[in-house]
Amino acid sequence: MTDARSPIRSLPPSYFETKYRADIDPWRFRTSPYEREKYKATTDGLSRPRYRRILEVGCAIGVLSALLSQRCDELVAVDGSETAIAEAARQELPNVRFEVAYLPDQFPVGSFDLIVLSEVLYYFDPADLRRLAEKCLSALDGGGEMILCHWLGETDYPLTGRQANDMFAEAIAKRRPTRVELHEDIYLLERFCFEIGDDEG
């Protein structure tokens, strides 16, 4: 029986590595109609036809990465699982750099004009999620955007999709982004647009 007083902790890299070693596509990113529709809604929800540099947090095996790569000069796609990153890199996308990184501590260097956080925030505990939000703010160009997308059903993760989305939105609210809800049904998809010149984290 779980002790209700036990602190919530972010899921470790080993959780995901075990998943991908057992099944290279454990969440059916390649075949699920849900994933296909969500990817389309995500790319349709981008406000610009093209971006300079995109960061995708939690890229998994790179299915969404391939779509995002068509909309930018450079994509940095990160995940905590070495097995998932190796599978993603097999696509040999010329403008994509796939990196093994466990966030928030191993945050990529450089700045981005779009940061995509899709089906990833509920794996973090509240403290790590807020630290991730701060790092995203620091790395985002003035006039940049963030896309958040999360399933709203029951989870056995540290947070629900709604909790994770709202906690992250609260953490970035000090920069006063324009918040646009693009979809809410079984998943929530939102875009946050920041003012040009407002690049102080």
Task: Tell me what each language-model feature is.
Residues 1-57, 61-110, 124-141, 145-201:
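Class I (Rossmann-like) S-adenosyl-L-methionine-dependent methyltransferase catalytic domain
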Residues 120:
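Hydrophobic adenine-recognition pocket in adenosine-nucleotide-binding enzymes
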